[in-house]
Regions:
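Single conserved hydrophobic/aromatic residue that forms the stacking wall/gate
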Residues: 1-9, 13
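Amphipathic alpha-helical scaffolding segments comprising HEAT/armadillo-like alpha-solenoid repeats
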Residues: 27-38, 63-73, 98-106, 131-135
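A contiguous pocket-lining binding segment that forms or flanks enzyme active sites
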Residues: 39-52, 60, 72-74
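Short coil turns that connect the paired helices of HEAT/ARM alpha-solenoid repeats
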Residues: 9-10, 41-43, 76-80, 107-115
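Long hydrophobic alpha-helical segments typical of transmembrane helices together
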Residues: 92-136
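Short, structured loop/turn "capping" segments at alpha-beta junctions
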Residues: 14, 28-34, 46-50, 61-66, ...
C-alpha cells in the first residue's frame, strides 16, 4: 500500500484510481485498518483523500464501517476536494445500502458541508434531495 502514498505529490486522478486497488484491496480481509485512520489524521489533504477513496474497494466488498467512520471523522473538513471525496464515498455506500446512507444523513446532513451533502445525495430523487438540502 505504500505505492499510493508515494503518489501524494502526483496527479489526483492517479491517486483516486490507484488507492482503491492498491490500499483498498490490501485491506480487504484485514482486521487492522489503522493506516486509514492514520492517513485521515494527517495534515496532508492528499493523504486524507487517499484514506477515504481507498475505501471504495471495501464498499464494493460490502464493508461500509470504515467509510462511515472516516466520513464522520472528516465531517467538518474545510477542503473542498475532501468534501467531494467523502460525499462520493457516502454516495457509493448508498448505492449498496441506501438505508445506511439515509440513517447517516438523518444524523449529520444538517452539519455537513454543502458540497459533501450534495455529492452524497446526487442520485436521490429531486424531492429527497430537496429535503436534505433544506436541513442545512
Amino acid at each position: 500500500y505504500e505505492i499510493p502514498l508515494r503518489l501524494v505529490g502526483s496527479e489526483m486522478c492517479i491517486r483516486d484510481s490507484s488507492s482503491p486497488y492498491i490500499l483498498g484491496s490490501y485491506l480487504i480481509g484485514k482486521e487492522d485498518r489503522s493506516i486509514l485512520y492514520t492517513l485521515a489524521e494527517s495534515s496532508s489533504m492528499w493523504e486524507q483523500r487517499i484514506a477515504v477513496v481507498a475505501t471504495l474497494m471495501l464498499i464494493r466488498n460490502g464493508e461500509f464501517d470504515d467509510t462511515i467512520k472516516l466520513a464522520t471523522q472528516l465531517l467538518h473538513t474545510e477542503y473542498n476536494l475532501m468534501q467531494k471525496a467523502v460525499g462520493w464515498m457516502l454516495r457509493e455506500v448508498g448505492k449498496r445500502d441506501q438505508s445506511l446512507l439515509i440513517e447517516y444523513l438523518d444524523r449529520y446532513a444538517s452539519s455537513m458541508p454543502r458540497t459533501m451533502l450534495r455529492y452524497s445525495i446526487e442520485k436521490f430523487p429531486a424531492e429527497k434531495r430537496m429535503h436534505y438540502l433544506s436541513l442545512r
